[in-house]
Amino acid sequence: HLFGALGSIKNLIDKIAAAKGVKTDDGRLIFDWIKTGDLISCELFDDYCDDVIWQLHNIQCILDPQRICIGGGVSENQIFIDGIKTAVKRFYQSLPIPFPQPEIVKCKYCNDANMVGAYLHYLRKNDER
């Protein structure tokens, strides 16, 4: 599977909605279920976070970052960030040998990062003229 499909929030939403027999694409509703401790939602969220950590670990093995920044709209949700951080701890504790654990942080601009980047690019391009 491609990471974009496996690690996407849409994938998480679809899995939880299907497991609960509900038709929705509302991520806020899904995270409300997780926040209130819904067993199905929490179990699938934990599985999702574990899948994401495998992908982040692969990136770590290739690029060796000390810090991994999580962005996008979902990064504004503390439940998501906490879930990823918990999965990181669980993953690295399960390894048979010590392995450096990257710091997981939320990106500063979250979902607005692309707009900030586009604006800075615009300013630089127009400053060159």
Stretches with model-predicted labels:
Residues 1-129:
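ATP-binding/phosphotransfer module of carbohydrate and carboxylate kinases, centering on a glycine-rich
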